[in-house]
Regions:
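Bacterial N-terminal signal peptides
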Residues: 11-23
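C-terminus-biased signal that marks the final domain/tail of proteins
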Residues: 28-139, 229-387
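Intrinsically disordered, low-complexity segments
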Residues: 6-8, 24, 51
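Flexible glycine/proline-enriched surface loops and loop-helix/loop-strand junctions
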Residues: 88-89, 217-224, 293
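Internal mixed beta-strand/loop scaffold within catalytic domains of large alpha/beta enzymes
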Residues: 127-222, 239, 352-356, 364-366, ...
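Bacterial N-terminal signal peptides that target proteins for export
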Residues: 2-13
């Protein structure tokens, strides 16, 4: 079985969990390491608005992003193993119909709008089947700060998303107003796969790709992401992240506007619910919980993740009580261990978008590209906050 697939979500979720991690003894007020750069560029990101039933929302996504879907499926069909991948994806589809039928309805709506069969479109949601060199394979960094450690009492979720440079032009915001769900704002790469998001109930999802040894046939992890973002409580979000019938999992970083922060380190058959006891959390692309380390697919290939994680912990720990949106922008632009830094650079993989979600105000800052080079634009898409 191949590994990783389109819209995959490996990310540096710099998760800081004291009680699991050793303390870092460094002077307070550690500053981000930034290289001198020219004036920041202004880059706009397209916003897609969808509403109605799940099928209708999917149909609207397909209508507005038809070109992207046709290109993505066309590229998949060029794979010499396409027939095998398509057949295996039908097994994942059967699980999804049984356990998350509402999101299969969304995918069906998209397929109908684009003029594809669902069996041809659904493999774009089954990253478990794809090679690790696929361009949407990711590495990411998360730095989360609760109201206990920010300067103004805001709850802030910061995230860098690292993929192939060729995906940067595809970065798209989708604003969902789906019947029976909270309003949801997501960022992804112009398809059904979601990298990060938040909702009107005050739940955000960021996180990181972790590659485990126990992938299996089941509900694709990209559908877990969609279900998490429909949650109205952090408990519901965690339940969605650990669906028993999952094919694999990410490290799901789930935060609520009360300042509760969990990192759900998952594989197909196990998970570790890591909780932030110090008011902040960092995670990247490797397992932290001792009992999850046996699932690490490539223990020799996580050096960048280890460095990014420890760097993120140090930056947040030593700035407790002073953390602001502007300071997080600096942290997300950090170049320690360049090019494999929090702000990642390179021809194979780079930071293709950077986001800071303010769960207190219900707003999002997004920069398409490296945050050391591109301005953040603010988006206020949530029309109402739920209690």
């Amino acid at each position: 079985m191949k590994r990783n697939t389109p819209f995959s979500k490996s990310c540096l979720a710099l998760i800081i969990l004291f009680g699991i991690l050793p303390a870092f003894g460094s002077a307070a007020g550690v500053q981000a390491n930034q290289q001198t750069a020219p004036a920041l560029k202004e880059i706009q990101v397209p916003v897609i608005h969808v509403k109605g039933s799940h099928y209708e929302a999917g149909y609207q996504i397909g209508t507005q992003l038809k070109k992207n879907f046709l290109q993505e499926v066309g590229e998949m069909k060029e794979d010499p193993n396409w027939k095998k991948i398509r057949a295996e994806a039908e097994l994942y589809l059967a699980y999804s119909r049984k356990y998350l039928p509402e999101y299969v309805a969304e995918a069906q709506g998209t397929a109908d709008a684009v003029g594809l069969g669902l069996e041809d479109l659904f493999p774009t949601l089954c990253e478990e089947l794809w090679d690790e060199n696929y361009r949407f394979t990711k590495g990411c960094s998360d730095l989360i700060a609760s109201n206990d450690v920010t300067a103004d009492g805001s709850v802030l979720a910061a995230h860098n998303n690292d993929t192939s440079p060729s995906t940067q032009e595809l970065v798209t915001i989708i604003h969902y107003q789906v019947d029976g769900e909270p309003e949801i704002v997501t960022v992804g790469y112009g398809g059904l796969g979601i990298s990060v998001g938040y909702n009107s109930a005050g739940i955000s999802l960021t996180g990181n790709q972790v590659d485990s040894t126990d992938m299996r046939v089941g509900v694709p992890r990209l559908l877990l992401v969609r279900k998490i973002l429909a949650a109205r409580t952090i408990g519901q979000a965690i339940d969605a992240a650990i669906l028993k019938e999952r094919a694999s999992d990410y490290n799901q970083v789930i935060t609520d506007r009360n300042g509760e922060i969990y990192s759900i380190e998952g594989s197909a058959t196990d998970y570790a619910p890591l909780y932030s006891t110090e008011g902040y959390l960092v995670h990247t692309n490797h397992y932290l919980a001792p009992w999850m380390r046996k699932f690490e697919f490539d223990p020799q290939g996580i050096t960048s993740s280890i460095v990014r994680y420890n760097r993120g912990v140090r930056l947040l720990k030593n700035n407790r009580g002073r953390i602001t949106v502007d300071l997080l922008k600096q942290f997300l632009s950090d170049h320690v261990n360049y090019p494999g830094s929090i702000c990642r650079h390179g021809n194979y993989v780079k930071t293709t978008f950077s986001v800071i979600i303010n769960l207190t105000t219900g707003t999002m800052l997004l920069a398409r590209g490296n945050p050391c080079e591109v301005k953040y634009n603010e988006y206020k898409l949530i029309s109402r906050k739920e209690n």
